[in-house]
């Protein structure tokens, strides 16, 4: 009697980088769908038409070689770079267990943000043994030709973990703010952060080119 062989599965991290174009992600996903690969995680970013796509898949060992071969041919056809990394079951479960960690949002804003500004902020994060999950630009694109007197730059850093010393982190961020001449906001990422709320700054037009109190009075019909 023939014994049924148990199908083994494995995780593969697929990394795609290169010039972005319409349909690129769809082309990659069509190959994964062809082999019924399970998507465990996915992330994509596009900076100045340069794509960075990461997909963590789980597929059976009989198909993994075919998946990588087809993806490699498709990447060559599209003119992008592709790489593969095996992820063990232990590594994957360790990553899953991290989802219970606390999350914080650090927002920094200034008239412009330099590499030195961002370095100062990320050093504070590193000193607290926290990880950066993502960085997102919140403000619009800045022209290098047209002069705009009302230029602002703001980025949001999504952090994972618990600060070693929250009070010290706040103090270090305050010191950074004074030395770098930028403003910051640090808050725990939970349901209360996403609730609608009103924040009013009375800053004598330092950052906001109007008087907030006067504008609120107009809205209230005062």
Question: Which residues are covered by each model-predicted region?
Answer:
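Active-site neighborhood of HAD-like aspartate-dependent phosphohydrolases
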Residues: 195-198, 207-222
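A conserved regulatory-domain signal marking ACT and ACT-like small-molecule sensing domains
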Residues: 1-196
């Amino acid at each position: 009697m023939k014994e049924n062989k148990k199908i083994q599965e494995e995780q593969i991290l697929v990394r795609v980088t290169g010039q972005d174009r319409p349909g690129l992600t769809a082309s990659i996903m069509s190959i994964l769908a062809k082999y019924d690969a399970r998507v465990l995680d996915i992330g994509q970013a596009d900076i100045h038409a340069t794509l960075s796509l990461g997909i963590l898949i789980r597929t059976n060992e009989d198909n993994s070689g075919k998946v990588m071969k087809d993806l490699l041919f498709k990447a060559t056809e599209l003119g992008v770079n592709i790489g593969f990394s095996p992820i063990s079951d232990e590594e994957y479960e360790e990553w899953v267990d991290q989802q219970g960690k606390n999350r914080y949002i650090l927002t920094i804003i200034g008239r412009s943000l330099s590499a030195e500004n961002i370095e100062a902020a990320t050093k504070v994060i590193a000193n607290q043994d926290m990880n950066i999950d993502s960085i997102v630009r919140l403000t619009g694109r800045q022209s290098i030709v047209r002069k705009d007197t009302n230029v602002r730059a703001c980025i949001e850093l999504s952090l994972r973990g618990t600060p070693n010393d929250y009070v010290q982190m706040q103090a270090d961020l305050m010191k950074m703010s004074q030395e770098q001449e930028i403003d910051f906001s640090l808050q725990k990422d939970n349901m209360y952060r996403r609730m609608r709320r009103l924040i009013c700054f009375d800053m004598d037009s330092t950052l906001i080119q109007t008087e907030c109190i006067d504008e609120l009075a107009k809205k209230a019909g005062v």
